Amino acid sequence: MRTASSSSSMMKFSLLDKKPKNYAQPEVLCHTFDTLSNLHKLLPNHLMETLYSYRSEEDKKKCENPELSGLERILARHELPKEINLTPKPNRMPLWKRKIINNVTDGWKKCHLLTRNTKEPPMSTIVVRWLKKNMQPTEDLKSVICRLSAFGPIQSVTVCGRQSAIVAFKDMTSACNAVSAFQSRTPGTMFQCSWQQRFMSKDKIYSKKCTQKTQPKECKQETEKTANNS
């Protein structure tokens, strides 16, 4: 008899030996929520029962498809309670295919061939502007080309308007000399040269270094005159 009573007492107090769960740990908390969600699925859902009651045989056959293609027809045919919330159709495109398409679009955005295909002007390209006034000698495209050819060989000339043109020199030093000589409009000619590339206008040190040794004498005299007048 003593053995039976002792065994029953051990069975009663066997749960006291277990340690309490520490819900501060994320693993224990996730496991608890998983068990609760599984138990919640086992509970009876009256809304789904009413939904299933409205289905016909055709709808049942169509609802066998995991995409639930026949539910829209059920909603259009019967006036169901507003409390029933139906999830929208899942996208038929698989996840791996969607990732491939996203990677392709990202690669197209980062494609370096697009910048290579667009023809950018060379570094030695400048923009020339001049004004025509009655009291001062008139300037035209021929006279502008003759002036700029004194700095070095010209590769191409593109007319932008009546009083402006884009000139591309063959070398960088010639372009630096032209820009440094005609940075501002002189009162005698109203003639101005500037860089077509925006970042080149900020790099004044490079243009000064190039023009100190390779600037023609005529340009030096014109720059000195402008400096004295200012």
Curated annotation (Swiss-Prot):
InterPro entries in the cross-refs: Nucleotide-bd_a/b_plait_sf, RBD_domain_sf, Tex56
A Pfam family that the UniProt record links to this protein: DUF4523
Domain of life (superkingdom): Eukaryota
GO molecular function: nucleic acid binding
UniProt name for this protein: Testis expressed protein 56
The species this protein was found in: Macaca fascicularis
